[in-house]
UniProtKB/Swiss-Prot annotation:
GO terms for cellular component: ribonucleoprotein complex; ribosome. Binds to the 23S rRNA. Coiled coil: none annotated. Residues 157-166 have a biased composition (Low complexity). Belongs to the bacterial ribosomal protein bL9 family. GO terms for biological process: translation. Residues 156-179 are annotated as: Disordered. Gene3D superfamilies: Ribosomal protein L9, C-terminal domain, Ribosomal protein L9, N-terminal domain. It comes from Porphyromonas gingivalis (strain ATCC 33277 / DSM 20709 / CIP 103683 / JCM 12257 / NCTC 11834 / 2561). Residues 167-179 have a biased composition (Acidic residues). NCBIfam families: L9. InterPro entries: Ribosomal_bL9, Ribosomal_bL9/RNase_H1_N, Ribosomal_bL9_bac/chp, Ribosomal_bL9_C, Ribosomal_bL9_C_sf, Ribosomal_bL9_N, Ribosomal_bL9_N_sf. This is Large ribosomal subunit protein bL9.
Length: 179
């Protein structure tokens, strides 16, 4: 089923896009919620006419997104998180925390347009993608640091583990030496 989106739908498309969705998703969710209409021939003609009339407005929105992207270039964030002794974060860093840190830097961004892949669950350097417009995205580098002072490096797999001798074995060795 083809539908015309009336608003941006995350992981599907942007306003005025014609997308193909499963019948149930279109009929039971998108259309009743007012997020889409069925893409009939007449609806496509109306959409084309509306896009021609709004071409100037769409160009202005894209220009504003590009200006905001230019202002976000060069921004890097540092996020403090509670961690275990091995550097694993309790919980994870989310797009909400990225939006809050950007707000502290003076850049207001809706958390829904920030994409983090893969999930951030350890201390280190990562990149968040901010989708300001369907054609304008910005990559924001950020570092996750520990609120704790010291972090012990996790032992690599296969590293030998020192084994303490048992006291009984030491006693047997002492008896053998005494004889």
């Amino acid at each position: 089923m083809q539908v015309i989106l009336k608003e941006d739908v995350v992981n599907l498309g942007y306003k005025d896009d014609i997308v193909t969705v499963k019948d149930g998703y279109g009929r039971n969710f998108l259309i009743p919620q007012g997020k889409a209409v069925i893409a009939s021939e007449s609806a496509k003609k109306v959409l084309a006419e509306n896009l021609r009339q709004r071409a100037h407005k769409i160009a202005q929105i894209k220009k504003e997104a590009e200006e905001k992207a230019a202002s976000m270039q060069g921004i890097s964030l540092t996020i403090k998180a509670k961690t275990s002794s091995t550097g694993t974060i309790f919980g994870s860093v989310t797009n909400i925390q990225i939006a809050e840190e950007l707000a502290k830097k003076g850049v207001e961004v809706d958390r829904k347009i920030i994409v983090l892949k893969p999930a951030v669950k350890e201390v280190g350097n990562y990149t968040a993608v901010v989708r300001l417009h369907k054609e304008v995205t910005v990559e924001i580098p950020f570092e996750v640091v520990s609120e704790n002072e010291t972090i012990i490096e996790a032992k690599p797999e296969g590293a030998p583990v020192p084994v303490a001798e048992e006291p009984a074995a030491e006693a047997e060795q002492a008896e053998v030496a005494a004889e």
